[in-house]
């Protein structure tokens, strides 16, 4: 059966559902097409089940400091792995059901289950149906990267798509790829009592480019499980287990978690028939402010775009793509300040301009280590550091890298400040409550301020104080 609509949306994940809301709001006819599991990557296999596992793991790990706090019996506590995994799935299912109840469950013939592919520009084949659309939104997501040579190891190779389905946990596991997913799941499994070994071909963790922050993260994460960097891994069968070799290191494990990133599902769409211009890697060339692919009437959104694979960005991209797909001319929208958070202990956060992208001759840096921070000491978490980057000429905050407990909250604060183009002086003049982790940020700002071409209203007054009649122009030079 042939069908004609104003907009066809491929993918019922976060980006696709956000695009659909905009198209529906504009009262355009549409279809939402989805192949595979429903329920968004975040709710089903990403953010939410991982955070459920992390919460249990961190609750259990807290027992490590019970003795010095005068709490007895901590050594007797342990995790019942099958019960833990059932708890994670129960929470996951609640969240997925909420997504479905508010989206595809009530859509009728506007929703089509099946895999779409282009047969010509603006014409899609979905099973026996042919769908013609004036405009198309590509939002069909990604899947974990698993080397083809690992297929022979079968179910012993885990990914973030499969690990939460385990009825029980393996006794030992190698985590290959120490980005956000690998670090979060590796530490959580270690805290739950699994013997974990981590590997990454890169010389960093979680994509950190700031050398001081990178070193701090490596030192602190190595307290949770052994980490080996800088070598590719090779897997070999060894009885019923897997031997993992990387450089001079070798370990035998029950399972391997492949956390080497996610690849786009574009290869399922027959993009060669779409009429969309793609780069050498087959990725559509698009404008990130309109999400429009070249001069076509095709838009792209979410993880499939190859940009930051985080929910708030996927939501925004879906909104932008859906808004523009429902209109004759595309509107360019301002994008949010980059924000990346790894929910390990300590948190690893990167905000604003990345260290490697900073103009070195125009930037000053401030640092605060957590050793003397009172609140961090009380929490038993006074290791790590905060690094902030500011433009020398204006004092404007450009970015930061944080390795600290509860830094997820500081990261939001800094992203908002960068979004508002605030200066270090303006930030120093905000209240910092005692005792709080925010005092660590105050320390980093105090460290960078004297290096900037900024001055307060009175040369001999503390920068935190603003005279009642101080003109605004005195805050920067």
Where would I find each of the regions flagged by the language model?
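Catalytic nucleophile loop
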Residues: 16, 179-182
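Short glycine-rich anion-binding loops that position phosphate/pyrophosphate groups of nucleotides
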Residues: 117, 142-144, 261-264, 370
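Flexible, glycine-rich terminal cap/loop adjacent to redox cofactors
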Residues: 8-36, 41, 48, 52-59, ...
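Gly/Ala-rich phosphate-binding loop of Rossmann-like dinucleotide-binding domains
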Residues: 20, 24, 186-191
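Glycine-rich flavin
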Residues: 2-5, 12, 21-28, 33-169, ...
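FAD-site-proximal beta/loop scaffold in flavoenzymes
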Residues: 154-169, 251-327
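A structured beta-alpha segment of the ubiquitous adenosine-cofactor-binding alpha/beta core
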Residues: 127-129, 233, 245-250, 262
